[in-house]
């Protein structure tokens, strides 16, 4: 089984994904962390040197590579859905879970994080809202499952994801 988590920065993809993988004896990969490990530099440095387009190319290559694996939980970068080719890969491979979190919670979780290049603007809160408006329909387009959350603890969100995946399996087995 391949589980792919999508959602905005700060939605909890890494936290939820790591815990889900641990509970189900699966391998966990965070795309941003994997890109950093392979390049030897942080994401903001890649943005600085190669621009967002360069980073997105690396992200697309990694997504295509990793989504051929099974026994994997993959936390994607928030912007992975911007590329139609990535959306096609997501739609064709694995179970895609959209962690949908209110923008207020996203803001609270990310406002002090300097490792988020897209938020290094004069009004980061407005930027989060703008990115959400742009990306939410794309996350919904690729998602097999939508889990609304953000206010509870990460364990609660992991349980929601587990239950949603169980229900998804039941539905797909019935057809």
UniProtKB/Swiss-Prot annotation:
Its EC number is 2.7.1.71. It comes from the Bacteria. Gene3D superfamilies: P-loop containing nucleotide triphosphate hydrolases (3.40.50.300). It is found in: Cytoplasm. One of its GO terms (molecular function) is shikimate kinase activity. Mg(2+) binds at residue 14. Its cofactor is Mg(2+). GO terms for biological process: amino acid biosynthetic process; aromatic amino acid family biosynthetic process; chorismate biosynthetic process. CDD domains: SK. Belongs to the shikimate kinase family. This is Shikimate kinase. The gene is aroK.
């Amino acid at each position: 089984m391949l589980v792919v988590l999508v959602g905005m920065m700060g939605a909890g993809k890494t936290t939820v994904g790591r815990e889900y993988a641990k509970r189900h004896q699966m391998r966990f990969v965070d795309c941003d962390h994997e890109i950093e490990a392979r390049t030897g530099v942080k994401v903001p440095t890649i943005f600085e040197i190669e621009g967002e387009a360069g980073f997105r190319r690396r992200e697309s290559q990694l997504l295509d590579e990793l989504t051929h694996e099974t026994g994997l939980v993959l936390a994607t970068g928030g912007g992975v859905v911007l590329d139609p080719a990535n959306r096609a890969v997501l739609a064709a491979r694995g179970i895609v879970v959209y962690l949908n979190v209110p923008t207020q919670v996203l803001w609270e979780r990310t406002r002090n994080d300097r490792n988020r290049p897209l938020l290094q603007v004069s009004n980061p809160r407005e930027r989060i809202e703008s990115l959400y408006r742009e990306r939410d329909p794309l996350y919904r387009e690729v998602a097999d499952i939508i889990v609304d959350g953000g206010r509870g603890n990460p364990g609660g969100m992991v349980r929601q994801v587990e239950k949603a995946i169980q229900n998804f399996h039941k539905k797909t087995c019935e057809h």
